[in-house]
Amino acid sequence: MAVRPICIVGDPVLHTATEPIPVGPDGSLPADLADLITDLYDTMDAAHGVGLAANQIGVNKRVFVYDCADARKKTVRRRGVVVNPVLETSEVPETMPDPEDDDEGCLSVPGESFPTGRADWARVTGLDADGTPITIEGTDLFARMLQHETGHLDGFLYLDSLIGRNARAAKRAVKSHGWGVPGLTWMPGEDPDPFGH
């Protein structure tokens, strides 16, 4: 369908919990959801992302797509969509995240990355594009992606969970880029790739 602009930190749609996708009595999903899912895949692929939530393209609906390896530097990837995800995780460490192992970025915070504490394991239950119940789980990078994308749908960015010097560095970065205000976007495939892919 179409590559859409990606909202940048500060847009209210990124800081608001999304609305669940309605499910019909027969388990059917709205007909227009297929177009949204296609746009999410097209946009994620053009941006070279490992995941993309609907509110990142300005749509306040509880759905995300992913194309993510189980671990960093692995070539085998899992690709899919989760409608109305519910997240379950192991305990999140209370220690300061490791700058190398816990580095995390976001298409809505283009070109920046910060060490972010995440649970080592995560599971998401929800529906696939046809309304069939699914469960996906993983560790390492895949678990990080599940937590990151579900966080988006709950109205949070990974910046919200940063601590200490990482939180201060992120705040400075947002200010230096002029972000933190409504209406800012970037266009994958047209604007320079902020992560240099």
Curated annotation (Swiss-Prot):
It catalyses: N-terminal N-formyl-L-methionyl-[peptide] + H2O = N-terminal L-methionyl-[peptide] + formate. GO terms for molecular function: metal ion binding; peptide deformylase activity. It holds the Pfam family Pep_deformylase. CDD domains: Pep_deformylase. Its EC number is 3.5.1.88. The active site is at E149. The keyword Magnesium does not apply. Fe cation binds at C106, H148, H152. Its cofactor is Fe(2+). The keyword Cytoplasm does not apply. Keywords: Hydrolase, Iron, Metal-binding, Protein biosynthesis. InterPro entries: Peptide_deformylase, Peptide_deformylase_sf. It comes from the Bacteria. One of its GO terms (biological process) is co-translational protein modification. Binds 1 Fe(2+) ion. Belongs to the polypeptide deformylase family. Removes the formyl group from the N-terminal Met of newly synthesized proteins. Requires at least a dipeptide for an efficient rate of reaction. N-terminal L-methionine is a prerequisite for activity but the enzyme has broad specificity at other positions. This is Peptide deformylase. It comes from Mycolicibacterium gilvum (strain PYR-GCK).
